[in-house]
Amino acid sequence: MRIGLYPGTFDPLTLGHLDIIQRAMALVDRLVIGVAINRDKGPLFSLEERVRMVESECRAIAANGGEIVVHPFENLLIDCARDVGASVILRGLRAVADFEYEFQMVGMNRALDAGIETVFLMADARRQAIASKLVKEIARLGGDVSSFVTPDVGAALMAKYR
């Protein structure tokens, strides 16, 4: 069984994330979505809220075949990959700036475990501008986030900023 790990903070989960998840499902038998506990980022949503958000929004994708498991983690990404039995880490790229950061991460991860590959999926052109940080800013200022997140995620965002 080919297991892939798609890690992220998912604060909030965006349509860009969902696009990568859907496309990643075609590459692996089981996709583990690693919801990172990143205290440096100071997430808007709690870990529990983010896990529920990912589980809820991925039900329809999983119903089309394949297995999705949501797994919170706080350790090194490469250790998380080992813990869940992943042979590949899947990452989405929106722009050159993403690549520069990810390139460094691949080098470090490869030094820690050369047996785990990293595969990059380019963001769909319609989703390249979507960034969780910007979506939160739009929501905070009362803007319409419906082009960037699902209705349920949008409602959760608006509730946070009321």
UniProtKB/Swiss-Prot annotation:
Cofactor(s) needed: Mg(2+)
Enzyme Commission number(s) of this protein: 2.7.7.3
InterPro entries, per this entry?
Cyt_trans-like, PPAT, Rossmann-like_a/b/a_fold
Any single GO BP term:
coenzyme A biosynthetic process
Q: Which domain of life is it from?
A: Bacteria
Q: Where is this site: Transition state stabilizer?
A: 17
Compartments annotated for it: namely:
Cytoplasm
According to the UniProt entry, its GO molecular function terms are: ATP binding; pantetheine-phosphate adenylyltransferase activity
Question: EC class of this enzyme?
Answer: transferase
Instruction: Give the residues the record marks as binding substrate.
Output: 9, 41, 77, 91
Query: What GO terms fall under cellular component here?
Result: cytoplasm
- Summary of subunit composition and partner proteins: Homohexamer.
The UniProt similarity line reads: Belongs to the bacterial CoaD family.
**The protein's role, per its UniProt record:** Reversibly transfers an adenylyl group from ATP to 4'-phosphopantetheine, yielding dephospho-CoA (dPCoA) and pyrophosphate.
What is the name attached to this protein's record? Phosphopantetheine adenylyltransferase
Gene symbol here is coaD
